[in-house]
């Protein structure tokens, strides 16, 4: 697991370095392209002139041919966008070339040499023209924008959380010593039983040690404990193990099923296997016994296989153990400062959560207020609409009444008025009768009271009769007046057109 992480971090670091180097190289080349390419062209011209002179001298003296088109070392390095490919001629071996050239120059005519010189000059001119064109293209190119956002980004730190080393060096040393001692003891003897989630690792000490010091490292539910060997035997986890003072040359083979548990770098074992327990002689020296393979090769434990083939499985087992614990809940491996930072983060989260809840409550209250205001505005608008409708209805009723008064018939109006008056009189009569009954009940206490009440009643009757007669007379009088008025109006309407018809009018005088 660690090796994979190291390889991944190394590859990502190399990729990042290459990416940054390419960017820096592009930027530097773009900045230096304007001035450097002109200087390179000038240097090429000088080099070409020198090579021509050297070639002329060599042809006279007969030395070996030199390569006139060989570029300098500085420009031989490949580049990506600013690279200019120049055709080059491979140099020949100096010893073999000198002999072959001398023999070839003797047979070659002078005209052929002149043609080759002209071809070389044409090649040089073509190369120079290409270089000048490339320089012009580089000068016309736009500079690279350094402020643009990169598509590929990398973190400053590949690991978000780093656990600092232990501050106490003494404790580290003690832990390392304990681990080395324990690993040495575990290499002597390893007994594992399938008893739930418990695994026991036993180490047998030398013969000089006392029996009280013999302890076994026991794992129970992920916790390690040092327990006495006698306690383990009394609990029935292990058979009694012979000590230095016990029987000589005695070995016991126990077929046990190994549980799927591991401590440190010990591999989990699933199949059953026979574990040989080393015994001690009287002198305290252990008898060396070579472990024998099991009878059934199919049930061979996985630890007996090739370690190179089991690397992936071992890595996966470590991964399974380490991935079972959450880094948030397990604070035993954090420093005090990291714990304090974690507490601060938790406080910050709680504070943000409270602020979010408070903000939500405020938003809800604001929404309620807005809804109430909108409802009040809607209610006020409805009330105004109702008032306006009532006012319009009242205006319509007044208009209808006025139109009825203008166009009504007088006889129909009189009949309506008479009916209304009759209803009012009937109501008055009922009220009067009720009042009289009350008075009669009040005065009926003797003969004198009865006579007095009778006289009062007779008087009221006479008054009512007189009032009715007067009302009838008044009504008859009004009817006569209305009839007379109607007759006068009708006679006036008929008389006016008759008079106008027989009258002469002179419009010119």
Swiss-Prot record:
InterPro entries (UniProt xref): CCDC181
GO cellular component, one term: sperm flagellum
Subcellular localization(s) per the UniProt record: Cytoplasm, Cytoskeleton; Cell projection, Cilium, Flagellum
Iron keyword on record: no
Keyword terms, alphabetized: Cell projection, Cilium, Coiled coil, Cytoplasm, Cytoskeleton, Flagellum, Microtubule
Origin: domain of life: Eukaryota
GO terms of molecular function: microtubule binding
Coiled coil: 335-377, 418-488
Region (Disordered): 27-122, 287-368
Keyword Cytoplasm: yes
Biased composition range(s): Basic and acidic residues: 41-58, 67-82, 337-368
Annotated function: Microtubule-binding protein that localizes to the microtubular manchette of elongating spermatids.
Family classification: Belongs to the CCDC181 family.
PANTHER family associated with the record: COILED-COIL DOMAIN-CONTAINING PROTEIN 181
Subunit details: Homodimer. Interacts with HOOK1. Interacts with HOOK2. Interacts with HOOK3.
Protein name: Coiled-coil domain-containing protein 181
């Amino acid at each position: 697991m660690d090796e994979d992480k190291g390889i991944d971090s190394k590859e990502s670091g190399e990729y990042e370095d290459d990416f940054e180097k390419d960017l820096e190289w592009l930027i530097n080349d773009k900045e230096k392209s304007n001035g450097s390419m002109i200087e390179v062209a000038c240097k090429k011209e000088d080099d070409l002139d020198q090579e021509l002179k050297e070639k002329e001298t060599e042809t006279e003296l007969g030395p070996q041919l030199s390569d006139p088109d060989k570029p300098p070392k500085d420009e031989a390095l490949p580049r990506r966008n600013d690279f200019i490919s120049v055709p080059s001629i491979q140099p020949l071996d100096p010893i073999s070339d000198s002999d072959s050239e001398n023999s070839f120059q003797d047979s070659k005519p002078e005209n052929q040499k002149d043609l080759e010189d002209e071809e070389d000059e044409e090649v040089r001119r073509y190369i120079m023209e290409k270089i000048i064109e490339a320089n012009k293209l580089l000068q016309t190119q736009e500079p690279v924008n350094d402020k643009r956002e990169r598509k590929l980004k990398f973190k400053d730190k590949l690991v978000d959380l780093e656990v600092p080393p232990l501050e106490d060096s003494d404790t580290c040393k003690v832990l390392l010593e304990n681990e080395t001692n324990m690993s040495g003891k575990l290499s002597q003897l390893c007994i594992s039983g399938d008893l739930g989630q418990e695994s026991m690792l036993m180490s047998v000490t030398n013969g000089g040690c006392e029996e009280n010091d013999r302890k076994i490292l026991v794992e129970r539910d992920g916790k390690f404990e040092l327990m006495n060997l006698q306690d383990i035997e009394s609990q029935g986890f292990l058979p009694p193990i012979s000590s230095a003072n016990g029987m000589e040359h005695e070995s016991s083979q126990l077929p046990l099923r190994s549980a799927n548990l591991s401590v440190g770098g010990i591999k989990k074992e699933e199949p059953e296997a026979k574990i040989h327990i080393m015994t001690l002689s009287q002198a305290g020296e252990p008898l060396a016994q070579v472990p024998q393979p099991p009878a059934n090769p199919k049930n061979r434990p996985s630890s007996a296989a090739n370690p190179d083939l089991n690397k992936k499985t071992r890595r996966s087992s470590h991964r399974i153990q380490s991935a079972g614990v959450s880094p948030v809940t397990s604070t035993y491996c954090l420093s005090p400062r990291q714990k304090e930072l974690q507490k601060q983060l938790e406080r910050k989260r709680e504070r943000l959560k409270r602020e979010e809840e408070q903000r939500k409550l405020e938003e809800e209250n604001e929404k309620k207020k807005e809804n109430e205001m909108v409802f009040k505005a809607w209610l006020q608008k409805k009330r105004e609409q109702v008032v306006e409708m009532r006012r319009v209805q009242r205006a319509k009723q007044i208009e209808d009444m006025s139109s009825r008064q203008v166009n009504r018939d007088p006889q129909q109006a009189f009949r309506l008025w008479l009916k209304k008056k009759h209803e009012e009189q009937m109501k008055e009569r009922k009220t009067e009768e009720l009042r009289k009954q009350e008075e009669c009940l009040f005065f009926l206490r003797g003969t004198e009271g009865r006579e007095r009440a009778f006289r009062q009643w007779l008087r009221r009757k006479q008054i009512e009769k007189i009032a009715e007669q007067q009302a009838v007379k008044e009504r008859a009088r009004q009817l006569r007046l209305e009839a007379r008025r109607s007759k006068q109006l009708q006679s006036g309407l008929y008389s006016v057109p008759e008079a106008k018809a027989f009258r002469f009018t002179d419009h010119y005088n």
